[in-house]
């Protein structure tokens, strides 16, 4: 583990700005969390422990959590199972106004496999990717269709909104998240212990999906 110190100079202090790979500590206790983020209570300076894990390490953790008979892991699996019911209730919901706007296109893509409500996980993922590639192609012109968040057209904020709704429609629990993103290229210019100033140009949004057994 390593540490990250955050000094909030001018951003809203209602929430804390928490590293994505937050390590175990007081901030992960239930009383410090809500469904939207981590409470800030007006604080503007704080230190976090963070965990840097590769994709392979994450898969090892997932396998351990799924197969281990350790009492602590068994307790975790029981708790996660209950939380998963909460996730499946709230994070698969799509507002009716969004369905009115996009359901025809979603169903058209799903029709190659059958009913949108009876897709395999792989088919659901493929349908979501096909739709998003039509809306936000890496090259060429996007298809002409009405999308949510028109005032933020072409931004990560619109992409994350559309992606979250699309994934949910195809049965994949998803949520919209936003914050500040520091790219690998930007971070490469700083040594350990150096201060990096993060401003509005780094403000981004992204979509997070729920992985059964491990979390967001």
Residue positions per predicted region:
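Helix-boundary/low-complexity linker signature
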Residues: 1-216
